[in-house]
Amino acid sequence: MVSVPTTWCSVALALLVALHEGKGQAAATLEQPASSSHAQGTHLRLRRCSCSSWLDKECVYFCHLDIIWVNTPEQTAPYGLGNPPRRRRRSLPRRCQCSSARDPACATFCLRRPWTEAGAVPSRKSPADVFQTGKTGATTGELLQRLRDISTVKSLFAKRQQEAMREPRSTHSRWRKR
């Protein structure tokens, strides 16, 4: 006859083995999708395209779909981008490379020249030239480009106004004597 402590230990051991095997099967089904992302070493982020330069903030915002933008007084900084940028050739004709060739918005965006490189708004026809030709109607692409031009001009104007306000103003000593 088997003693009671031995029976108790064998039942507890069998129960632990059964629970451990069951836990292992459930954990294996849950860990399989997660292990595929861990096998690559980094979290894959949704990207519409890949920017040629991380300094082109408009491109980074357009291409990376799941970043978080934090507004700071001086600049807008992206967080959650993952790995640091890799070196690329400087002679890239496009500002970014689309993930899907069937995305016309991405193709149009990547062919445009970034505002940071341009330095100023690209020259267009003056309002007088448009008035003389009589063509005031615009296609959707031209209208969108005009809106972007207006936005850029306003932001450049606001930056220049802030810089003008920061400069110390010289006052004449005559005004202080009164």
Curated annotation (Swiss-Prot):
The keyword Transmembrane helix does not apply. Its main location: secreted. GO terms for biological process: angiogenesis; artery smooth muscle contraction; axon extension; cell surface receptor signaling pathway; cell tip growth; cytokine-mediated signaling pathway; endothelial cell migration; energy homeostasis. Residues 160-170 have a biased composition (Basic and acidic residues). Residues 25-46, 70-178 form a propeptide. Keywords: Cleavage on pair of basic residues, Disulfide bond, Secreted, Signal, Vasoactive, Vasoconstrictor. Residues 159-178 are annotated as: Disordered. This is Endothelin-2. Endothelins are endothelium-derived vasoconstrictor peptides. Expressed in lung, but not in placental stem villi vessels or cultured placental villi smooth muscle cells. One of its GO terms (molecular function) is endothelin B receptor binding. It is found in: Secreted. The lineage of its organism: Eukaryota, Metazoa, Chordata, Craniata, Vertebrata. Residues 96-111 are annotated as: Endothelin-like. Disulfide bonds join 49-63, 51-59. The gene is EDN2. Belongs to the endothelin/sarafotoxin family. InterPro entries: Endothelin (IPR020475), Endothelin_toxin_CS (IPR019764), Endothln-like_toxin (IPR001928). The record marks 69-70 as: Cleavage. GO terms for cellular component: extracellular region; extracellular space. Residues 1-24 form the signal peptide. It comes from the Eukaryota.
